[in-house]
A protein has these predicted regions:
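Glycine-rich phosphate-binding/catalytic subdomain of phosphoryl-transfer
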Residues: 104-107, 132, 136-140, 144-148
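Conserved beta-strand -> loop -> alpha-helix junction used to position metal-binding or nucleic-acid-contacting
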Residues: 111-128, 135-140
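Conserved "right-hand" nucleotidyltransferase catalytic core of DNA-directed polymerases
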Residues: 1-68, 113, 130, 141-143, ...
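Short, glycine/acidic-enriched loop or turn micro-motifs at the edges of active sites
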Residues: 31-33, 99-100, 121
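Conserved catalytic alpha/beta cores of large enzymes that bind or transform nucleotide phosphates
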Residues: 363
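Acidic beta-strand-to-loop metal/phosphate-binding motif
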Residues: 26, 91-101
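Phosphate- and divalent-cation-binding pockets in alpha/beta enzyme and binding domains
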Residues: 100-107, 262-263
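Nucleic-acid-processing active sites and adjacent nucleic-acid-binding tracks
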Residues: 58-93, 224
Length: 363
C-alpha cells in the first residue's frame, strides 16, 4: 500500500495498559474478509482474518489491533490471551451480529461459555418491521447518535482504499476510535433494549434465541459433507441427458420466451400473453401443457437448472474441503432472514435443495 503524500492526523494509539472489565462486556471485531459479500463470512473457508478486537463495558472501551497492514499493532498472542481471560470472567458477552464475530473468534481459539447477546436479534424480536437492524440505525433509535466515521473515511481517501472493506490495510491509529465506538454503542444499546424486552414479555424467547446463536455458528463451521466424486459423475450424467433432449430442438433457445412462443404456436398451442402482448412462457404454462415436445423442453430446462445451481455451483464450487458451510439466520436482518421466526439459510440456501424428483434425490 502506497503512503499518501499528506498523512491525516490521528491521536489514537493502541493501549499500553490492558484494563480489567466488568462481567458484562461488548465485543466487536475488525476483519479482512475479501469474499464476504459474494460467499458469506470467510471464517468458514479460512480465507480472511481478524485484525483487531474492541471491548467495552459501562466504564471504558478499548481496541486491540494485531493484524493491520499499516502497522500500530499489538502482539497477537498477547491480545488473544487477554481477550480469552476477559470473556472467561464475564457473565454475558454482547455483540451486534454475533454469528459473524463468534465464527471469527473460533478461528482464533477464543470460545465463549457465557450467554451470548446479539442486539440485532433482540431488535428483531422487539420490532419485526424495523427498516434496518444495523448498528448505526439502532444507535439512532436508542441513543440519538450515530457512528463517527469521518476520520476513518478521511484516512481511507488519503490512502486510496475502501473505508469499510479495506480498513484493515490502514494503520490502526485511523481505525481505533471507530472500532471502539462499535463496541461502545453495542453495550449502550443493549441497556436500552433490556427493559423493552421485559415489558413486551419477550425475555424467555430472547434467552432461547441467545442459546441458539452459538449452536447455529457451530453448524455453519461444521458444514455438511458432500461426495465430490459422485457430484462430478452426476454432473456428467445430467449434461448428457440435457444434450440428448436439446438435440431434438435444433437451434431453439429453450430460455428465449419469443422463440418458445413461436415454437409452441407452430405446434398448435395457445401461448398466454402479458398485458403488453408479450409471450408469457412461464413454469405454469409448461406444467399445464401436456404436449410431449413441450414436456421435453421443460425437462431440459429443469435438468439444466438443477445441474448448474445445485451440482456445479453449490456442491462443486462452494464446497470447502468437501463440505458445504451454509449460514443460518435466526430472524430478519439486513442480510436476509425471515420475519416469522423460522430459520433460514444462505450462502448457499440449503432450503432450496430439491428432494422430491429423482434428480433431487441424487443431489
Amino acid at each position: 500500500m502506497q503512503q499518501p503524500l499528506f498523512v491525516p492526523k490521528a491521536t489514537w494509539r493502541p493501549p499500553v495498559i490492558l484494563p480489567s472489565f466488568s462481567d458484562s462486556v461488548a465485543i466487536d471485531l475488525e476483519t479482512c474478509d475479501p469474499n464476504l459479500k459474494r460467499s458469506g463470512p470467510g471464517y468458514k473457508r479460512r480465507d480472511g482474518k481478524v485484525v483487531g478486537i474492541a471491548i467495552a463495558d459501562e466504564h471504558q472501551h478499548i481496541y486491540l489491533p494485531f493484524g493491520h497492514l499499516g502497522g500500530d499493532n499489538l502482539d497477537k498472542n498477547l491480545v488473544i490471551s487477554y481477550v480469552n481471560n476477559v470473556i472467561k470472567e464475564s457473565k454475558e458477552v454482547l455483540f451486534a451480529n454475533a454469528s459473524y464475530d463468534l465464527g471469527w473468534l473460533e478461528t482464533l481459539g477464543v470460545t465463549i461459555s457465557s450467554p451470548v447477546r446479539d442486539i440485532q436479534i433482540a431488535e428483531a424480536l422487539i420490532d419485526e418491521e424495523c427498516f434496518s437492524y444495523s448498528l448505526n440505525n439502532l444507535a439512532k433509535k436508542y441513543l440519538k447518535s450515530t457512528k463517527q466515521e469521518q476520520g476513518l473515511r478521511d484516512a481511507a481517501d488519503a490512502f486510496d482504499i475502501d473505508a469499510k472493506g479495506e480498513m484493515w490495510k490502514l494503520p490502526a491509529r485511523y481505525v481505533g476510535e471507530y472500532a471502539e465506538m462499535d463496541a461502545r454503542l453495542t453495550w449502550d444499546i443493549y441497556q436500552h433494549q433490556i427493559p423493552v424486552l421485559k415489558e413486551q414479555d419477550l425475555w424467555n424467547i430472547w434467552e432461547l434465541e441467545c442459546k441458539l446463536t452459538p449452536v447455529l455458528v457451530h453448524m455453519t463451521m461444521q458444514g455438511v459433507p458432500v461426495d465430490l466424486d459422485k457430484a462430478e459423475q452426476l454432473n456428467k450424467k445430467l449434461k448428457q441427458q440435457e444434450s440428448n433432449l436439446r438435440t431434438q430442438f435444433g437451434d431453439l433457445d429453450i430460455w428465449s420466451p419469443p422463440q418458445l412462443a413461436k415454437y409452441s404456436e407452430n405446434l398448435g398451442l395457445k401461448v398466454p400473453r402479458t398485458e403488453k402482448g408479450n409471450p408469457s412462457v412461464s413454469k405454469e404454462f409448461f406444467i399445464a401443457c401436456d404436449h410431449p415436445k413441450v414436456k421435453q423442453i421443460y425437462d431440459a430446462r429443469s435438468i439444466n437448472r438443477l445441474r448448474k445451481v445445485f451440482v456445479e455451483d453449490i456442491i462443486l464450487h462452494q464446497n470447502y474441503k468437501g463440505r458445504i458451510h451454509a449460514d443460518f439466520k435466526q430472524t430478519a436482518s439486513d442480510s436476509g432472514g425471515t420475519r416469522s421466526g423460522r430459520l433460514s439459510s444462505a450462502n448457499p440456501n440449503m432450503q432450496q435443495v430439491p428432494k422430491r424428483s429423482d434428480i433431487g434425490k441424487a443431489i
